[in-house]
From Swiss-Prot:
PANTHER family: ATP-BINDING PROTEIN RV3427C IN INSERTION SEQUENCE-RELATED, CHROMOSOMAL REPLICATION INITIATOR PROTEIN DNAA. CDD domains: AAA. This is Insertion sequence IS232 putative ATP-binding protein. InterPro entries: AAA+_ATPase, ClpA/B, DNAC/IstB-like, IstB, IstB_ATP-bd, P-loop_NTPase. Keywords: ATP-binding, Nucleotide-binding, Transposable element. ATP binds at G108, P109, S110, G111, V112, G113, K114, T115. One of its GO terms (biological process) is DNA replication. It holds the Pfam family IstB_IS21. Belongs to the IS21/IS1162 putative ATP-binding protein family. The lineage of its organism: Bacteria, Bacillati, Bacillota, Bacilli, Bacillales. GO terms for molecular function: ATP binding; ATP hydrolysis activity. It comes from the Bacteria. The keyword Nucleotidyltransferase does not apply. Signal peptide: none annotated. It comes from Bacillus thuringiensis subsp. berliner.
Length: 250
């Protein structure tokens, strides 16, 4: 016949409370030595389970975000890019912009850190259990085009609209045909004033009509993107070129 301690361990394992079962002995000893109350003991024991589950949830949310890398804001070299307001980026990391369904646009040449910063904000959001998804513009349009051919466009648009934060990377790096531009507009329109979107682009807004090959459609997209948006213009050298020369010097 099991004693009470053994039965409690069995019960915790049966309920799949693995961390509580694993730390039960240590918590009981700590409770006795420090004269904790029954409630205080339970709080300490359940905290082990909650901490692990929270970490697992964070890991899952970050993984679901499909980020290209795990680069966070503390890895960004603000000294190399002095045109960037560090405090502004840290404010983005606080996720205050999500509460107002505001957008962020990172504008600048290739290699200046647009994707790094967008990813950093996305990871911060995912860690706060905010539904977040990262996708390159070309891949997004290919997915929407395929969905349209397969008569499931509405479902796919709803899929990308459901994320509280959607990050669309590299707008303008590849040409966008008129039909794809219409698909892009549909998504932006569905998210407008309902969800936050982060965009990265190397194309000045005046040239978006060339990217989307339709001035009216480009203006409609810009109108919805920029209405509640903060634009971060980055002027500086490429990190990749800097790293290349650093390796040559080594």
């Amino acid at each position: 016949m099991k004693n009470s301690y053994q039965q409690l361990t069995t019960n915790l394992e049966y309920l799949k409370l693995k961390q509580m079962a694993q730390h039960l002995g240590d918590v009981v000893d700590f409770s006795i030595n420090n004269e904790l109350s029954f409630v205080e003991t339970l709080v300490k024991l359940t905290n082990y389970e909650i901490d692990v589950r929270e970490q697992n949830m964070i890991h899952s949310m970050v993984k679901m975000g499909a980020f290209p890398h795990r680069k966070e804001v503390d890895e960004f070299d603000f000294e190399f890019q002095p045109s960037i307001n560090k405090q502004q980026i840290l404010d983005f990391i606080s996720l205050r912009f999500l509460e107002q369904q505001e957008n962020i646009v990172f504008l600048g040449p290739s290699g200046v850190g647009k994707t790094h910063l967008a990813t950093s904000i996305g990871i911060a959001a995912a860690k706060k259990r905010t539904s977040t998804y990262f996708i390159k513009c070309h891949d997004l349009l290919q997915n929407l085009k395929r969905a349209k051919i397969e008569n499931r466009l509405e479902s796919r648009l709803k899929h990308y609209t459901k994320y509280k934060l959607l990050i669309i990377d590299e707008i303008g790096y590849l040409p966008i045909d008129p039909e794809d531009a219409k698909l892009f507009f549909q998504l932006i329109d569905m998210r407008y004033e309902k969800r936050s979107t982060i965009l990265t682009t190397n194309i000045n807004f005046k040239s978006w009509d060339e990217v989307f090959q339709d001035p009216k459609l480009a203006n409609a997209i810009l109108d919805r993107v920029l209405h509640h948006a903060t634009v971060v213009s980055i002027v500086g050298q490429s990190y990749r070129i800097k790293d290349h020369f650093s390796k040559e010097n080594d």
